[in-house]
């Protein structure tokens, strides 16, 4: 550990300033010793504060307002974001740790890259003094005095610049940006259309004054072709209903009565094609045919699990009906 520096070596000729000691856990004993010595020698008009550098870098706390003097009791190299967080025109004292002469060159280069100015002479061989760069001032634009305006001289503002009009870009580039057809597709994208895209949509007129629009029906002696369109639409609807009934009729765990459903031999649970159109639901609840258990109070199979038509039902004494 280097020899301790007397606190009077860090006195500021410009007046009292807040002294902040930034330390780390790697150099905790040196940090505590310097903080104690500065507090014992500080005049009543100045204050000495201590803070861990990680709290400053993590924005857990902020630096005191200027005027400010910062003591860095940190291992080398210094954290990359520390130098940029130091306020302008702030004097810093870097307390060099022992056996770190090989890293002094990189330290001076880092300080010079951030425009820190060295302060000579240094308080001690183990302490470096630097001053952070001052805040940049706003540039002032000097303007020549303009003559008094007259009736023949146009009035212009001092320091005004001529208005720069934006020139039109390449017209071919703009046209390609908004083009509908792509040169990458030879047919202009027509091959990407599906049969559903090519189908002409139905013309449905919206309701007026809240009254629904009635659909025009074909006459008995229709000759305009509307009757054929209605028949084709009804055929498509009927085919869709029959297709939807297939999935229902092919279920083998329903309980439709036997007089409405007769399975073919060897294909139990499969309805014959001629019986599918004749089958209708007769249940009041509509759940028994969907494979649900018998739950209606008037059902003779109340409490039994669903079974297939034609299956022999055996109820044991232990069953709770």
From Swiss-Prot:
This is Fe-S cluster assembly protein DRE2. [4Fe-4S] cluster binds at residues 285, 288, 296, 299. It is found in: Cytoplasm; Mitochondrion intermembrane space. Its cofactor is [2Fe-2S] cluster; [4Fe-4S] cluster. The keyword GTP-binding does not apply. PANTHER family: ANAMORSIN. Keywords: 2Fe-2S, 4Fe-4S, Cytoplasm, Iron, Iron-sulfur, Metal-binding, Mitochondrion. [2Fe-2S] cluster binds at residues 203, 219, 222, 224. Belongs to the anamorsin family. Monomer. Interacts with TAH18. Interacts with MIA40. GO terms for molecular function: 2 iron, 2 sulfur cluster binding; 4 iron, 4 sulfur cluster binding; electron transfer activity; metal ion binding. It comes from Cryptococcus neoformans var. neoformans serotype D (strain B-3501A). Residues 123-168 are annotated as: Disordered. A motif (Cx2C motif 2) lies at residues 296-299. Residues 1-161 are annotated as: N-terminal SAM-like domain. InterPro entries: Anamorsin (IPR007785), CIAPIN1 (IPR046408). A motif (Cx2C motif 1) lies at residues 285-288. Transmembrane segments: none annotated. Residues 203-224 are annotated as: Fe-S binding site A. GO terms for biological process: iron-sulfur cluster assembly. Residues 139-156 have a biased composition (Low complexity). Residues 162-197 are annotated as: Linker. The gene is DRE2. Residues 285-299 are annotated as: Fe-S binding site B. Component of the cytosolic iron-sulfur (Fe-S) protein assembly (CIA) machinery required for the maturation of extramitochondrial Fe-S proteins. Part of an electron transfer chain functioning in an early step of cytosolic Fe-S biogenesis, facilitating the de novo assembly of a [4Fe-4S] cluster on the scaffold complex CFD1-NBP35. Electrons are transferred to DRE2 from NADPH via the FAD- and FMN-containing protein TAH18.
């Amino acid at each position: 550990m280097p020899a301790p520096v007397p606190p009077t070596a860090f006195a500021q000729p410009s007046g009292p300033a807040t002294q902040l000691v930034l330390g780390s856990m790697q150099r905790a004993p040196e940090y505590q010793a310097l903080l104690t010595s500065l507090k014992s020698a500080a005049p009543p008009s100045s204050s000495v504060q201590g803070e861990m550098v990680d709290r400053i870098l993590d924005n857990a706390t902020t630096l005191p307002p200027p005027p400010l003097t910062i003591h860095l009791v940190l291992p080398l190299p210094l954290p990359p974001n520390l130098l940029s967080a130091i306020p302008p025109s702030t004097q810093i004292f870097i307390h060099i740790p022992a056996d770190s002469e090989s890293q002094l060159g990189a330290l001076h280069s880092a300080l010079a890259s951030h425009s820190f100015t060295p302060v000579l002479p240094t308080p001690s061989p183990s302490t470096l003094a630097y001053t952070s760069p001052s805040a940049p001032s706003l540039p002032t634009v000097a303007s020549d005095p303009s003559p008094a305006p007259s009736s023949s001289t146009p009035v212009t503002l001092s320091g005004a610049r001529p208005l720069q009009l934006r020139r039109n870009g390449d017209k071919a580039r703009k046209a390609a940006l908004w083009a509908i057809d792509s040169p990458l597709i030879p047919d202009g994208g027509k091959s990407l259309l599906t049969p559903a895209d090519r189908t002409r949509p139905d013309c449905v007129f919206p309701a007026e004054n809240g009254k629904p629009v009635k659909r025009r029906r074909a006459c008995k002696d229709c000759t305009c072709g509307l009757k054929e369109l209605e028949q084709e639409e009804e055929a498509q609807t009927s085919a869709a209903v029959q297709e939807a009934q297939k999935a229902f009729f092919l279920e083998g765990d329903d309980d439709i009565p036997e007089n409405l459903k007769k399975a073919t031999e060897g294909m139990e649970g499969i309805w014959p094609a001629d019986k599918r159109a004749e089958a209708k639901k007769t249940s009041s609840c509509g759940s028994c045919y969907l494979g649900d258990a018998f739950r209606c109070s008037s059902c003779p199979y109340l409490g039994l699990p669903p079974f297939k038509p034609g299956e022999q039902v055996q109820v044991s004494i232990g069953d709770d009906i």
